[in-house]
From Swiss-Prot:
It is found in: Cytoplasm. One of its GO terms (biological process) is urea metabolic process. Keywords: Chaperone, Cytoplasm, Nickel. It comes from the Bacteria. Residues 146-162 have a biased composition (Basic and acidic residues). The gene is ureE. GO terms for cellular component: cytoplasm. InterPro entries: UreE, UreE_C_dom, UreE_N, UreE_N_sf. Disulfide bonds: none annotated. GO terms for molecular function: nickel cation binding; unfolded protein binding. Involved in urease metallocenter assembly. Binds nickel. Probably functions as a nickel donor during metallocenter assembly. This is Urease accessory protein UreE. Residues 144-170 are annotated as: Disordered. Belongs to the UreE family.
Amino acid sequence: MFRATAIIRADKVIDAVPAGHAVLERDERHLRRKAIVLEGGEKVLVDFAEPIVLEHGDRLVLDDGREIEIRAASEELYEIRGRDPLHIAELTWHIGNRHLAAQIESDRIFILRDHVIKAMLEGLGATVTDVTAIFSPLRGAYSGGHSHDDHDHHHGHHEHDHEHHHHHHD
């Protein structure tokens, strides 16, 4: 089994022809150490130091230098539309308040299907439609800024040449 320890983000890909493809749903694209199956049946061990979210078009770099392209699988979603931008903002707030993953666009929101949430959104006046599409939700504010872009694995620390002032309150 080949091993992948580096990633090239989709917007940094130079080589147009990957050695293979893996089609993964949104939950499967959030990983740290996991074996994934390529379209041809070959297995690859993804082995990162920290959890990462793979996006459609990203490439995994194998230990032999080959690249595997990640393709987002189509998933069963709800497309949510509001009456106007303010209504969409209100609907987005209710979705976020329930800690649901959401793909937010200027005139609509996508979430994974859940009949209870659908009823709530319709009760709030939303138009909710069943769709099948690639799901690329926003990453949370606390998802971390660390990435493995451009094969960067440096985890060093830098020196501080300034003082740290700590204020303690009793």
